[in-house]
UniProtKB/Swiss-Prot annotation:
This is Ribulose bisphosphate carboxylase large chain. Its EC number is 4.1.1.39. Its cofactor is Mg(2+). It comes from Hamamelis mollis (Chinese witch hazel). Binds 1 Mg(2+) ion per subunit.
Length: 465
């Protein structure tokens, strides 16, 4: 009983247009740009093969297992409108190919090898459908949106944050001072920048201590619960957990992690620690644009966002739609819903390729951050709704009178927008008017309005359908 050695087309084994997808399959939508002369079926089948059981030639050991049970299958290919050389290849992966509770393993399988494949000019993972059978093997966010609101006792409005700038170079004492001023002025949170870890000018332990002091002082004076995202990201998992432990000992409510540079294994480790110890977890997406910005190669951010919800985080940066960083409105709202909601219908107009049912996995608060200021407040309130965190770094610290008045201006603008919305006014149409009215009785807001009245970041978004 020999076996038929040699090389055969992938599509003979891995292109199965008659396949009915199972409820337990992980489904992927790839944007495939094959090399000239490679038919789309072969390219799609090659992706399915190389990201599951296949290799470039038939091997004797194939006979020792059931390929039909374990192989990925390219089950549908559709052309991309307006792109002659591209196709969307849909691939179904049997659940048994993946280790339970490991985003790391999921990505190693699905995107680990196949992106360097010679038969393809480019490849982009546009979306993943995670079946409940797989998502139930993950803890997910340490707490989720409702528990966070209960812990912070803040309801019926977006939360306000501010990244402390200059991001590098402040001493711990001065850093803590800036934190105190912002929280005292009316913000809910302040934030370590993503690259503030533990550098010579400010070691992590000193920063944690001075920030904790600032939090307690601001809480005592305002009667509100305050937080500062203490960045626990470090060079090793052990060091990261050590920092999280210290944050817990200080009694602060929230820590932070850079999940892409830190890696999914570290992130899931930290998320488990945070749930076990009552810490909220803020996630920064530093490095995401390296992966998601090219239209025809890499991975769309909605995939990274889904992966984060599985790995665990209570907040994640998700673009602004209006500020200085990337984000097209409908597409952004698509993955914002994927982060917050339990059940999201397939909607290609928003870039959502599959219906996603998260069952009981807690939701994540999207964070809008980057180049936003008081004039954006009505748009942000309208676009993101209550379940979001609006972060004004320069838009707080750049206030001509200083940090605390900058915080006051943002809080007044937010409360004015929320009140106007609750009274039934149209934020999209009357936004500027609402801000102007509020600035009449808030000199801090009036000063902020004056400084930023002309600022715009008008560039075409790259992230289009």
């Amino acid at each position: 009983v020999g076996f038929k050695a040699g090389v055969k087309d992938y599509k003979l084994t891995y292109y199965t247009p008659e396949y009915e997808t199972k409820d337990t399959d992980i489904l992927a939508a790839f944007r495939v740009t094959p090399q000239p002369g490679v038919p789309p079926e072969e390219a799609g089948a090659a992706v399915a093969a190389e990201s599951s059981t296949g290799t470039w030639t038939t091997v004797w050991t194939d006979g020792l297992t059931s390929l039909d049970r374990y192989k990925g299958r390219c089950y549908h290919i559709e052309p991309v409108a307006g792109e002659e050389s591209q196709x969307i290849a849909y691939v179904a992966y049997p659940l048994d190919l993946f280790e339970e509770g490991s985003v790391t393993n999921m990505f190693t399988s699905i995107v680990g090898n196949v992106f360097g494949f010679k038969a393809l000019r480019a490849l982009r993972l546009e979306d993943l459908r995670i079946p409940p059978a797989y998502s139930k093997t993950f803890q997910g966010p340490p707490h989720g949106i409702q528990v966070e609101r209960d812990k912070l006792n803040k309801y019926g409005r977006p939360l306000l944050g501010c990244t402390i700038k200059p991001k590098l170079g402040l001493s711990a004492k001065n850093y803590g001072r800036a934190v105190y001023e912002c929280l005292r002025g009316g913000l809910d949170f302040t934030k370590d920048d993503e690259n503030v870890n533990s550098q010579p000018f400010m070691r992590w332990r000193d920063r944690f201590l001075f920030c904790a002091e600032a939090i307690y002082k601001a809480q005592a004076e305002t009667g509100e619960i305050k937080g500062h995202y203490l960045n626990a990201t470090a060079g090793t998992c052990e060091e990261m957990i050590k920092r999280a432990v210290f944050a817990r000992e200080l009694g602060v409510p929230i820590v932070m992690h850079d999940y892409l540079t830190g890696g999914f294994t570290a992130n899931t480790t930290l998320a488990h620690y945070c749930r076990d110890n009552g810490l909220l977890l803020h996630i920064h997406r530093a490095m995401h644009a390296v992966i998601d910005r090219q239209k025809n190669h890499g991975m769309h951010f909605r995939v990274l966002a889904k992966a984060l919800r599985m790995s665990g985080g209570d907040h994640i940066h998700a673009g602004t739609v209006v500020g200085k960083l990337e984000g097209e409105r409908e597409i952004t709202l698509g993955f914002v819903d994927l982060l917050r909601d339990d059940f999201i219908e397939k909607d290609r107009s928003r870039g959502i390729y599959f219906t996603q049912d998260w069952v009981s996995l807690p939701g994540v608060l999207p964070v809008a951050s980057g180049g936003i200021h008081v004039w954006h407040m009505p748009a942000l309130t309208e676009i993101f709704g209550d379940d979001s965190v609006l972060q004004f770094g320069g838009g707080t610290l750049g206030h001509p009178w200083g940090n605390a008045p900058g915080a006051v201006a943002n809080r007044v603008a937010l409360e004015a927008c929320v009140q106007a919305r609750n009274e039934g006014r149209d934020l999209a149409r009357e936004g500027n008017e609402i801000i102007r009215e509020a600035s009449k009785w808030s000199p801090e807001l009036a000063a902020a309005c004056e400084v930023w009245k002309e600022i715009k970041f008008e560039f075409e978004a790259m992230d289009t359908l």
